[in-house]
Amino acid sequence: MALSSVSSCEPMEDEMSIMGSDTEDNFTGGDTCAEATRGLVNKSAFVPTQTVGTVSALRNVVGDPPKSVVVSFSASPQRAQPSNPKSERPAFGHGRRNRRRPFRRNNWKQQQRGWEKPEPENVPARQSAGSWPKRSSLPVHMRLGQRGGDSSSADSGHGGAGPSDRWRFKTRTQSVARVHRNRRRGNANHGSNTPGRSAGDRLNAAAASSIADVCRRVTSSRIGEMFHGARETLTTPVKNGGFRAENSSPWAPVLGFGSDQFNPEARRITWDTLVEHGVNLYKLFEVRSHAAEAARSLRDAVMRGENLLEALASADETLSWCKMIVTKNLPMRTRDPIISSSVALLDNLRLKLEPFMRCYLSSSGSPTLAELCDHQRLSDVACVPTFMFVMLARIARAVGSGAETVSRDALGPDGRVLADYVPGACLAGTLEAIDAHKRRCKADTCSLVSAYTLVPVYLHGKYFYCNQIF
């Protein structure tokens, strides 16, 4: 029977276009509706090839129209529309109307009107309907993510079976966590380059005039007057006689202001002497408040200008003083001149030892110097330098917090960490660590840094001195 006689089972033109067929070659005969219906199936679709995958072949079956797996709103397909039977383009999957529209930043609602709402069963389990990120002005590669599968596989994604590669970007999948991370990164970069910064970040007229007129304000004669006035101020640093220690006090020679230059060997004492007479100096710091205030200011300035050997000796002085206070069961007052200057001492030691400690700590797998001083964990102590930095950082933190006293627990449980400390260990242990690392490290630059840290003699680094004022 001819195909025209099967009027009740004859496929309509729209139905044929939905099946993706433009001819009637598959309907060569058959007297029944079942035979005509069997002729509607494209048998060649069940033959797998190298270029068309199994999923794409099953999509040609009329009885099972394809369902698109929606991985993002930008990849949602439109409903299949009937097309011209004479057209060579397929009616669904990759039609002209299904091409990706450009993202409209200010017209997102109009772009979303013609799209289907994603079915809950087709949404991936790791991306629920409530976890989709909001649209923003992020770049395309940050919004769309990475490609979902291999371009050579038709089963790797929704658009992998297309006739060309121009739809393959629809297979991109996006992690919600990556979207929010990229958004935070973009906001951080945007915050560092604010649009109004370039307009307002400029010198005002008063500052520009002050910088330009410095050559007229400062001359060589005025420089001489500055130094002369500074010397006069230092001749009488403290009023009311200073600490006014008794002549019989063992601390009388060291409590004067500007009497003699500091000589470490001339002022060397033993640990037993410090334990015996240290309480007298402790009380003088507490009673003579005006002298103690001047002592704090001057000692803070001295700590910042010391060389490495002097700074290490000051570290031993600070820890020995704290150990004496713990031994005598006295409160460690933060207004004590020796304890108060621990902040300046720590800054100077970090400045002097930072180049060496960078390689020294990394070679042993220890935390960086900044992490040691910030975290201040006793578990990070592995040698004398790390012990020195952790203990000074704990004392400096208490001083900087504004507390009246330093807690005994800051020096370990009930201050027992200093029980094994021997006065002079900071100087001897740090010098030993520098020399041992210098012999062990193979890097040439590290050898130079270690040697210059021990012997800071000028070899190279300064290239010119330019001064057109005086």
From Swiss-Prot:
<keyword id="KW-1048">Host nucleus</keyword>
<keyword id="KW-0805">Transcription regulation</keyword>
<feature type="binding site">
    <location>
        <position position="446"/>
    </location>
    <ligand>
        <name>Zn(2+)</name>
    </ligand>
</feature>
<keyword id="KW-0945">Host-virus interaction</keyword>
<feature type="binding site">
    <location>
        <position position="441"/>
    </location>
    <ligand>
        <name>Zn(2+)</name>
    </ligand>
</feature>
<feature type="compositionally biased region" description="Basic residues">
    <location>
        <begin position="94"/>
        <end position="107"/>
    </location>
</feature>
<keyword id="KW-1035">Host cytoplasm</keyword>
<keyword id="KW-0804">Transcription</keyword>
<dbReference type="GO" id="GO:0003723">
    <property type="term" value="F:RNA binding"/>
</dbReference>
<dbReference type="InterPro" id="IPR008648">
    <property type="entry name" value="ICP27-like"/>
</dbReference>
<comment type="similarity">
    <text>Belongs to the HHV-1 ICP27 protein family.</text>
</comment>
<keyword id="KW-0244">Early protein</keyword>
<feature type="zinc finger region" description="CHC2-type">
    <location>
        <begin position="359"/>
        <end position="446"/>
    </location>
</feature>
<keyword id="KW-0863">Zinc-finger</keyword>
<dbReference type="Pfam" id="PF05459">
    <property type="entry name" value="Herpes_UL69"/>
</dbReference>
<dbReference type="GO" id="GO:0006355">
    <property type="term" value="P:regulation of DNA-templated transcription"/>
</dbReference>
<feature type="region of interest" description="Disordered">
    <location>
        <begin position="62"/>
        <end position="204"/>
    </location>
</feature>
<comment type="function">
    <text>Multifunctional regulator of the expression of viral genes that mediates nuclear export of viral intronless mRNAs. This immediate early (EI) protein promotes the nuclear export of viral intronless mRNAs by interacting with mRNAs and host NXF1/TAP.</text>
</comment>
<dbReference type="GO" id="GO:0008270">
    <property type="term" value="F:zinc ion binding"/>
</dbReference>
<feature type="binding site">
    <location>
        <position position="437"/>
    </location>
    <ligand>
        <name>Zn(2+)</name>
    </ligand>
</feature>
<feature type="compositionally biased region" description="Basic residues">
    <location>
        <begin position="178"/>
        <end position="187"/>
    </location>
</feature>
<keyword id="KW-0479">Metal-binding</keyword>
<feature type="binding site">
    <location>
        <position position="359"/>
    </location>
    <ligand>
        <name>Zn(2+)</name>
    </ligand>
</feature>
<feature type="compositionally biased region" description="Polar residues">
    <location>
        <begin position="71"/>
        <end position="85"/>
    </location>
</feature>
<keyword id="KW-0010">Activator</keyword>
<dbReference type="GO" id="GO:0042025">
    <property type="term" value="C:host cell nucleus"/>
</dbReference>
<comment type="subunit">
    <text>Homodimer. Homodimerization is required for transactivation. Associates in a complex with RNA, and host export factors NXF1/TAP and ALYREF; these interactions allow nuclear export of viral transcripts. Interacts with three host shuttling SR proteins SRSF1, SRSF3 and SRSF7. Interacts with host SRPK1. Interacts with IE62; this interaction enhances IE62 transactivation.</text>
</comment>
<dbReference type="GO" id="GO:0030430">
    <property type="term" value="C:host cell cytoplasm"/>
</dbReference>
<keyword id="KW-0862">Zinc</keyword>
<feature type="region of interest" description="Disordered">
    <location>
        <begin position="1"/>
        <end position="31"/>
    </location>
</feature>
<protein>
    <recommendedName>
        <fullName>mRNA export factor ICP27 homolog</fullName>
    </recommendedName>
</protein>
<keyword id="KW-0694">RNA-binding</keyword>
